[in-house]
């Protein structure tokens, strides 16, 4: 089953992953960037043999593979800790996750007044642009380390994040693991 470390971008997900990785995966509790590989970022593309080398024409191909990818991850019946920036959403009938794939959620909340400055620096935006980013109900982000599309204009990956408030509410109102969920607020 999956334990999600979920957050809006620039909220401290990597920091929490660093703490957990040092605690769970090192013999002496010391941090190393190599340890972050133990808590990967969820991408349906990375975990789906069907999607791994396939060229994607539209976003719905990614959304429709969220649950099948999670079922593949959970085939080994082990606990998997995964990072996500996706909102807990349903797009075109495709749920991001469900009670059959999720054991618990660690949701990280960062005050949006602090987050906006971090967003502006990270994405090289002015504060007005960062505010629009933060309040965009249909916001999608793409990996920064790669181009959004490959040389054939096919999608590589994406995260549907929505606005900061909708993202927070989507995970706060999760119904199938409310007791096991944990919220980090800073």
Regions found by a protein language model. Name each.
Residues 186:
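G-domain G4 guanine-recognition motif of GTPases
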Residues 1-183:
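PAPS-dependent sulfotransferase catalytic domain
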């Amino acid at each position: 089953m999956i334990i999600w470390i979920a957050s809006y971008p620039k909220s401290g997900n990597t920091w929490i992953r660093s703490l957990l990785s040092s605690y769970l995966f090192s013999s002496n509790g010391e941090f190393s960037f190599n340890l972050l590989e133990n808590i990967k970022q969820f991408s349906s593309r990375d975990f789906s043999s069907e999607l791994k080398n396939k060229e994607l024409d539209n976003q719905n191909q990614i959304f429709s593979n969220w649950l099948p990818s999670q079922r593949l991850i959970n085939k080994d019946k082990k606990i998997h800790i995964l990072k996500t920036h996706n909102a807990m959403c349903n797009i075109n009938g495709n749920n991001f996750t469900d009670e059959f794939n999720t054991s618990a959620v660690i949701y990280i909340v960062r005050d949006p007044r602090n987050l906006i400055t971090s967003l502006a620096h990270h994405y090289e935006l002015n504060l007005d642009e960062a505010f629009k980013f933060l309040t965009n109900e249909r916001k999608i982000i793409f990996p920064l380390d790669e181009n959004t599309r490959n040389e054939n204009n096919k999608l590589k990956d994406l995260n549907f994040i929505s606005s900061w408030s909708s993202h927070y509410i989507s995970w706060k109102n999760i119904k199938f693991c409310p007791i096991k969920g944990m919220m980090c607020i800073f």
